[in-house]
Amino acid sequence: MCGLAGIVGEVDLMEQVLLHMSAAQNHRGKETPNSWVSSFIDARVGLMHNRMKTIDMAVAPKQPFEDNDTGLVVMLDGEIFNYEDVRRQLENYYSFTTRGMCEVITKAYDRWGDGCFDRFEGYFSIVIYNRWSEELLLCRDRFGIKPLYYATQRGNLFFASEIKALFAGGIRSLLSAERWASYLAYSTYGSPYETFWEGVHQLPAGFLLHYNGYSLVEKRWYEFEKRVSLWSEESPERLPEAFLEQMHRSVGYSLMGEMEKGLSLNGSLESALFISLMKEIGLPRSLKSYMHYRGKLHQSGVLWSAEMLAETPLPMEQVKITKSMLLKELDYLARWQEEPIDGLNTITYSAFFRVMHKLSLIHISEPTRQAEIS
C-alpha cells in the first residue's frame, strides 16, 4: 500500500499543500514522504508519494521516481508481480540503473505507450508525468483494486489515493445530494466514476486519464468482456489445464516478497483450493495462517480449516471477533470512511485486520484477494 497525491496548476505554496495531502493519507505509507515539483505548460506539476514496501524491499528506489533516459516521472501504488519478466523483455532496448518496479514502468511506457499496462500482471494505480511532452497520465488496474480519485478546482487538477487527501489539498467537501438520495432509496453506489461528493470523481477500473494542461481525456485500456471472450476460442479439453495454470500463477504471486505474511482462511472451497495449490508450489518460510470467526467456534469453518492445514507445517491461529470489537470498529469506520461501507463483512474484516496490525503483519493473503494493512 502506498499513497499517491498530485496537483497540476497554479497553486500557492504547492509543496506545502502536497505535504497536507500526504499527511491526510500517511497511514498508507509510514516512510518519510517524497515530493517532486516542476514546471508544467504555464503552471506547475507537483507529485507526492507515501511508501509502504511489500515486495522489492531492498531494491525499491524512492518515489516519485525520475528516469532521465525516458524523461518520465512515475509513482506506483500496488504491485506488478511479473515486473522481472517485463524487464527481461526490455533489456535488449534499454539499460537499467535500478532493480525496482518503477524503472520497469518508465521503460515499458516509453516502449509500448498505453499498451504497456496490458502486459502488467498485478493490482496498481500508476501516475506518469512526461517531462518532455508535459503530459500527465493516471492509470487504474483492471478491477479497481487500488483507489485513485481526482477533482478540478479553479482550473487546477488534484488527484490522490483517498478522498480525504483531496480535501486536505483544498478541494471543497460538499456532499452529493443526488448520490446520497439514490443510495438511501435504492442502495446504489452510482456509476463507476462517481463518488458521494460533488466534483470528486474516481478513475474507473481499467481506465486511463490523460491530461495535457488543457483537457482531461478518459480512455478504457482493459475490457473484461473482451478478455473473457478470448477463452471461448480455447478447446474444451484445454480449458481445465489453462485454468490450473492461471491459478498456480495467481497463488504464486500472492506469496511473493520478502516480508512476513499472514494467510487468512475462511473454511471455504476457495481456501481448500488455495492450500492445495500452495502445497504444490512450496510454502514460504515467513508465512503464518489465521482465521477469524464470529459466534461459536464449532459453527464456523475454523475446524475444517485446521483439518485442511494438518498436512502442512503451517500453524493456524484463531481470531474471535466479538460484539464489542465490531461496535468499536463501526465507530472507527464511521469517522474514517468518506463513503458508505458495504455491510457487516467490512466491519468484521476491519476488526480482523486491526488484530493483524497489532501482530505487526501488514501483508495478508487470502484465497480470493490480498490486503495491505496500515
Enumerate the language-model features and the residues they cover:
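Active-site rim elements
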Residues: 341
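Short acidic/polar active-site loop segments enriched in Thr and Asp
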Residues: 31, 361-362
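Single conserved hydrophobic/aromatic residue that forms the stacking wall/gate
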Residues: 362-366, 370-374
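Glycine-rich phosphate-binding loop signature in dinucleotide/nucleotide-binding domains
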Residues: 257-258, 356-361
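Aromatic/hydrophobic pocket-lining residues that form π-stacking "cages" and hydrophobic walls in ligand
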Residues: 305, 352, 363-364
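A conserved donor-nucleotide-binding helix/loop in the catalytic core
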Residues: 344-357
